[in-house]
Amino acid sequence: MMRIALFLLTNLAVMVVFGLVLSLTGIQSSSVQGLLIMALLFGFGGSFISLLMSKWMALKSVGGEVIEQPRNERERWLMNTVATQARQAGIAMPQVAIYHAPDINAFATGARRDASLVAVSTGLLQNMSPDEAEAVIAHEISHIANGDMVTMTLIQGVVNTFVIFISRIIAQIAAGFLGGNRDEGEGSNGNPLIYFAVATVLELVFGILASIITMWFSRYREFHADAGSAKLVGREKMIAALQRLKTSYEPQEATSMMAFCINGKSKSLSELFMTHPPLDKRIEALRSGEYLK
């Protein structure tokens, strides 16, 4: 949940900054081919920068502390559990971190399967049984083993490319109609101020709308991560963990930022912008074995 939201926000910010730099420096492509190349470079560039920054951003955002050497029995159990599951999943031992938060949560991130991070909240360790916590950790290990962050990066790169390309095509048309006069030497994109304003606004708007695609993919991969956890530690443990989440403390952020929602209580249109499917749907998918085949 958290890794996807941070990735999308960082990615959108990088993409907009690139667009601002291009417009302010007057680097505006005058041909469709040139614009497409620029969109590809900056679309995928923003995604990969977000991916490379993901571990640092995630740790900074929650104040997480990487465990170098276990200092108590709880940290020792956590390290041993992650090591065992990583070995079962065929990946290198991830870095392990703990962050202070009352809510039950965990996330995994990293640019590569063999250079990843798993972080859990103190709320998870305090409020979940060992079996439930084991299932949540296995869920995050499955995300790493499945390469979900890299796949998300590629999907986001394609989405970014279309957002930049379409936004700037429309901006060129708008600048030409509303203020551009190419005969007076204002450039092939028409009025530069209008071009700059329209392109920036459209990139923001289309970027938010395009997040529907990436959120759908995130929800789809959550089902597979649940199935991966069931294969690693057992279906009943994962179901028990999800049932625990239904009755857990609800973070304040979940009421104002749907990208961070994990409780699955939201309905209707807002589900399009959720990173996770509703918990009841995830439990039903595990019971039916739909993603375990």
Curated annotation (Swiss-Prot):
Which of the residues are on side Periplasmic? Answer: 25-33, 179-192
Gene3D superfamilies for this protein: Metalloproteases ('zincins'), catalytic domain
Question: Which residues point to the Cytoplasmic side?
Answer: 1-3, 55-157, 214-293
Recorded GO molecular functions are: metalloendopeptidase activity; zinc ion binding
Intrachain S-S bonds: none
Tell me the superkingdom of the source: Bacteria
**What keywords appear on the UniProt entry?**
Cell inner membrane, Cell membrane, Hydrolase, Membrane, Metal-binding, Metalloprotease, Protease, Transmembrane, Transmembrane helix, Zinc
Query: So what EC number does this one have?
Result: 3.4.24.-
Question: What processes in GO biological process is this protein linked to?
Answer: proteolysis
Cofactor detail note: Binds 1 zinc ion per subunit.
Q: Which residues cross the membrane?
A: 4-24, 34-54, 158-178, 193-213
- Major location category of this protein: membrane
What does the record give as the active site?
E140
What is this entry's stated membrane topology? Multi-pass membrane protein
The record ties this protein, via InterPro entries, to: HtpX_protease, Pept_M48_protease_HtpX, Peptidase_M48
Alphabetical GO CC annotations of the entry are: plasma membrane
Which residues make up the binding site for Zn(2+)? Answer: H139, H143, E222
Family that this chain belongs to:
Belongs to the peptidase M48B family.
Name used for this protein in its record: Protease HtpX
Q: What is the lineage of its organism?
A: Bacteria, Pseudomonadati, Pseudomonadota, Gammaproteobacteria, Enterobacterales
